[in-house]
């Protein structure tokens, strides 16, 4: 159960960020203790509004291609029926983009006014065609002009600048056409499909994602076109959170208009794990006030995504009234992961903080009730029993900030008041200002319902991404065993600790080359006992190899009925018949000495 490291520091050909070690020098929000929703341009997508003072819009995506008109129309209407505010349809070819004409005719003939967005990769010609028929078109800066996604050959500083000119040359006419037709554009960067020139310049980093978006956004600014939505997606919530934060700061730094954000975590998976991973990433950004429209990407029927997204928005509503913590600015860099340095302190004989991974505990009274500890690494006594120091509200934190010596060194601090994220950040700021390295315990008492489960995942996901938290205790969720497992699952969802097999799986779309929901179930059943590995399950190659960069092994659609197996980012077995692919994956894992019998 080792901690999972971040994907490394930004690499160093060039940086506009100047180190970015202090939040106050490069802020993404005005106040990290009292977030308010970011004030943005309002984008019109048909009858829908994104950003400004509009409610956060929920969207989803069909699993069909536009050429299959009947199924595409049926899925669009089904999504609209459950409250989806915008439906996205992939158009992988020019012919598919042409098919959008008939899809839109039938959707509107059915009395459905939900706006539609086309999703385009590799095909600028298809993007131009899609503008004729739908209200919004998403393009991917990783492959709109640059299509050499996985090659870094012949990349130089000169070729990088020449590439920027090519982007302007190719993208400007598209922006002009969108402006003429009254359409909206999403500049949708994916961590898994950065252009080769961006990888050359910045590495496989958050900075590369941000600069990819900024390059295309500069074209929109030059054309005085502001009907733009931005997204920076990754399958790693920690990467996604840092990327959106940095983009908000960069837009402000550059003096661009504040464009709205489409927030999501790609390849979240299915079931409870998919929901927790989505909450850890999307929820953290909702709590930062950075989301204007969201999509929860589950490897399930698209209509299942909508109620989860709606519940997540409800769970992560921002407080109406600010809290007065009266502590110094929380300067910790929000763009580069580094766990807060702490001294080791023991709770019930178990070391918390220091070099130990984030520990999972259980309330001692809960163990007494059930007689079962179930994987908990320590038993938490009363919250007011040494070495625990409980702060219940902003006044407690402010009092400590004024007189930190009143609390003995070697304590474990715990905030149990409202708004866990802002409270723990304020606590950390007070500790840092006092030169204290006492550990912090993240404690949450929740009820057994989806809203509170999503919220606690968002809270903990946000805090561990900030490098805060040395132990986690969830109290009140079903029972002691379930509370402990939920805590471990949230830490895994937030890429903090791995306690079971990690599955990275994309939602199905029109590019998917096999029944991914069925295959996902089979792979989970076959490999779910391998707690020390990560497996990517991807429908196609558009984002697959890149988005599963964290995975040890990958199962990727390589063609109709054919699968390519990956080890890391390297394709090691190609053109495998789908019916043989799972056993071939077993053999590959055995060959690498990582197989264990269930």
Where are these regions (language model features)?
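N-terminal active-site wall of soluble small-molecule enzyme domains
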Residues: 91-133, 367-370
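N-terminal amphipathic alpha-helix/helix-capping segment at the start of soluble metabolic enzymes
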Residues: 21-60, 175, 179, 318-365, ...
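Short, acidic/polar
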Residues: 67-78, 122-127, 278-282, 369, ...
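Hydrophobic or amphipathic alpha-helical targeting/insertion segments
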Residues: 113-151, 157-177, 182
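Hydrophobic faces of well-ordered beta-strands that scaffold small-molecule active sites
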Residues: 56-62, 87-89, 116-120, 137-139, ...
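Active-site mouth loops of central-metabolism enzymes
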Residues: 53-71, 116-123, 198-210, 266-276, ...
